[in-house]
Amino acid sequence: MNLQDNTLSRVEFLDYFERFSDLGDFASKGTQLAIDLSTAQVFRTKLTTTCTGLNVTNTPDNGNANAVGFSLFFVGDGTARTMTWNIGSTAASWAGGVAPTYTSTLNKIDVFSFLSRDGGSTWLGFVGGQNF
């Protein structure tokens, strides 16, 4: 194994994990949801107020234009909320150009994933599932 070139070749994983961070209720976090990719890759929050976007920080970039991603579990609080799908100052791109609507039903979970192939300058959004 030689990690001086930042490459692992022909690796077989027996187990695979991603770090999880429970962000708690969103109302206490301000208007943008803070996503710190140095702490986790999977996040959970309960939207208890309107969210004007995601503030993604510490996007890993080793200069090799590697892809990076994260997932969000949104838990409904029983009240319809507005979600603006901006990441930083740029709107996430969704299939068909249509952003999803957040499920507000009490304790129902929506899962969304985001992928960037340019170090976090632009993001593609994916619906992993809704109304779980």
Enumerate the predicted regions with their spans.
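Short carbohydrate-recognition loop motifs
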Residues: 39-45
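Intrinsic low-complexity, repeat-rich intrinsically disordered segments enriched
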Residues: 1-38
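Residue-level detector of functional hotspots within protein domains
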Residues: 29, 40, 98-100
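Acidic, glycine/polar-enriched metal-coordinating patches/loops
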Residues: 46-132
